[in-house]
Amino acid sequence: MVGKNMSKSLTLKNPGRVAYDSGGIKMFWEKKIEHHARHLQNEDIRVRRSALNKLRVGWAEQLEGRNKMLQGPGRCPDRVPEATESLHTKDKKAA
């Protein structure tokens, strides 16, 4: 009870200051939130423009293809290794 009476007495002594402070605090945080939202938006645009993600995807595709090739032709029927193709074409020419 003492705390409530104390805060009421402070509010009643300076009512203009409390209203001004709450408005100033509200404005301060609104600016902070707006600035943060703008910063997040700019960061998102920067990341989208970055080539790093494209490079990662390209390297992942290359590694996946290399792994499939190393596993052998029996495990990857959709792609014939380049060395096998060249051998078959030479055989056809010789025959």
UniProtKB/Swiss-Prot annotation:
Region ranges (Disordered): 68-95
Listed Basic and acidic residues bias regions: 76-95
PANTHER family associated with the record: PROTEIN FAM240B, PROTEIN FAM240C
Similarity comment: Belongs to the FAM240 family.
Listed name of the protein: Protein FAM240C
Native organism taxonomy: Eukaryota, Metazoa, Chordata, Craniata, Vertebrata
